[in-house]
From Swiss-Prot:
Function: Transfers the 4'-phosphopantetheine moiety from coenzyme A to a Ser of acyl-carrier-protein.
UniProt organism field: Methylorubrum populi (strain ATCC BAA-705 / NCIMB 13946 / BJ001) (Methylobacterium populi)
One GO term (biological process): fatty acid biosynthetic process
Protein name: Holo-[acyl-carrier-protein] synthase
A Pfam family hit: ACPS
HAMAP family linked to this entry: AcpS
Taxonomic lineage of the native organism: Bacteria, Pseudomonadati, Pseudomonadota, Alphaproteobacteria, Hyphomicrobiales
UniProt gene name: acpS
InterPro entries: 4-PPantetheinyl_Trfase_dom, 4-PPantetheinyl_Trfase_dom_sf, ACPS, Ppantetheine-prot_Trfase_dom
Cofactor(s) recorded in Swiss-Prot or TrEMBL: Mg(2+)
Amino acid sequence: MILGIGTDLCDIRRIENSLERFGERFTHRVFTDGEREKCDRRAARGPSYARRFAAKEACAKALGTGMSQGVFWRDMEVINAASGQPTLRLTGGAREHLARMVPPGHEARLHVTLTDEPPLAQAFVIIEAVPVAGAS
């Protein structure tokens, strides 16, 4: 069953301006160490950061919290599965809120898609609850 859907459209130029103007103050406030490491290895950092920013916004919308109710930027980390497919790792308030959303006998699955076509980056997040095998 679908528990939440979120989407966000982010102007890459806005993220590039924040990177230029605020530098590490911006990246350390919004992104995890792993996200910063991955983005900073890219020649075009702006689109990479913008996709992740959009994913965090979309996830907060799917959670139904926005950036409130104890959910913070760094509670949501864009990671890649072994296949390269993007997904999200939730910690802190985001993880706690997700746990409250999931009905007994189910587990959460997060589906993420990211894209960019300058000057825009976009993300969709779907939170799904699937039955746990053997749960009654």
